[in-house]
Amino acid sequence: MTIHEKLDCLTRLKSEINKNDLSDNGRLDLTTEQLSLREELFAHPDPWMKVQIARYAHRPNAQYFIQAMFTDIIELHGDRQSGDDNAMFGAIGRFLGVPVTILAQRKGSNLQENLQCNFGMNSPEGYRKALRLMKQAEKFGRPILTFVDTPGAYPGISAEEKGQGEAIARNLMEMSQLKVPIITIVLGEGGSGGALALSICDKMIMLQHAVYSILSPEGFATILYKDATRAAEAAHVMKLTAQDLHANGFVDILVAEPQEGIHLAPEKVVATFTQHLREELIQLRKLKSDVLIANRYARLRKFGEVQR
């Protein structure tokens, strides 16, 4: 049972008991218990708790941020090779009046939407669509903003047959050489190569309770411990939290969230995001393309220097 399910269970218990006892003296007041449980759960969240917060069904997805932060949005479709991918949102729009290209891994807000966008797991068509729009952005001098929120690339046979690995690898190569600014925003889950394919950037901004790792804790536990139930233990070992990644130099800016998650006050987080994006775009747009690419390459090379 996740932390949010525990809290929901406590709320339902209060409702059911009060429904059966309508007298003022008999009514159950669980407010104190709820607050105590919330405080205990969220005061010092461990890595596994952060994974659960990042996966929370009511956590605002990329579509929320895009609608709140951009204007004149025109969605674009197709990779011009084999098809489209609903899990990859691509568009042009304006950020505070500046034309930008927007790429986002799309998750739904309910089961039907998640089925339509494959729970945020991209196919090769999605990565190729993203690359097509990034090359278009380079041609017209538009900064690129990518929103990462995926458990990983789609691992199905159809994706492998269409060249999933090649599509991801090509994005890594091409993004490292693009002549326009690239800023990546990690909203929830940043899983495996599926996230990396949108993360070769000049600056990375990450929400406080987001996670980013080579694979899921369940996958890590299955491979190394031969036991998927040890996922919580694996999460501690993987150093996947925003705080760990910031300390090791992988993430440039951390954006604070409410203690229980962004879903409690998304408007405040949007305002903070907007300010950070504005400041970073101003600085990056001042750089010549050769300096931009050199700095991006140097940033990537530093990752191998992390001390374990």
Located regions from the model:
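Intrinsically disordered, low-complexity segments enriched in small/flexible residues
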Residues: M1-P99, F119, E267-R308
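Conserved catalytic cores of soluble enzyme domains
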Residues: I3, V148-R278, I282, K286
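Short, motif-level signal for alpha-helix interfacial/capping segments enriched in acidic residues
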Residues: S23-N25, G126-Y127, F220
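Hydrophobic alpha-helical segments
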Residues: M88-G90, Y127, M134, A232, ...
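Cleft-lining beta-strand/loop regions that shape enzyme active-site pockets
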Residues: R94, T101-S176, I182-L187, S192
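Generic, ordered loop/turn and secondary-structure boundary motif
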Residues: A43, A54-A57, I66, F70, ...
